[in-house]
């Protein structure tokens, strides 16, 4: 993928990060998906006092995209203030395996806005559980 697409997607994730609602952890995360048609869809983490209700930036961006009819994702950028790059949690990895299995995932530190690490979804979640719709015994 062209470097300009990568830097543009990281920039979109960084802008989304500014809209994060993280009053408890103060760990703000932004995410941006790139579709094959070139559209960028973003999201930011939203926290709740009941931590189990908190939603990660990756899931917010994914749900935003899916509920607006967007799919066929080619890349995801995730940005936070994390020297080694903000790694997607297990729940986000599962949803990526289901809805964006061919996407390249870039993680970037918000201070430099350069990609720290790059992964395929299969590298993030090897042996992912994928149910077969309608499969029953």
Spans of model-derived segments:
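Stable alpha-helical structural segments in soluble proteins, enriched in small hydrophobic residues
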Residues: 9, 13-16, 57, 61, ...
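Short beta-strand scaffold segments in enzyme catalytic cores
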Residues: 28-35
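Compact, glycine-rich, soluble single-domain proteins
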Residues: 45-59
């Amino acid at each position: 993928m062209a470097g300009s697409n990568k830097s543009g997607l990281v920039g979109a994730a960084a802008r989304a990060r500014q809209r994060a609602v993280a009053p408890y952890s103060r760990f703000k995360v932004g995410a941006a998906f790139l579709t094959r048609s070139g559209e960028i869809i973003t999201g930011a983490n939203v926290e709740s006092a009941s931590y189990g209700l908190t939603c990660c930036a990756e899931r917010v961006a994914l749900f935003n995209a899916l509920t607006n009819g967007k799919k066929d994702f080619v890349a995801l950028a995730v940005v936070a203030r994390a020297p080694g790059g903000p790694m997607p949690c297990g729940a986000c990895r599962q949803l990526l395996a289901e809805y964006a299995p061919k996407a390249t995932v870039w993680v970037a530190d918000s201070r430099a806005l350069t990609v720290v690490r790059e992964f395929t979804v299969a590298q993030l979640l090897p042996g992912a559980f994928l149910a077969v719709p309608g499969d029953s015994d």
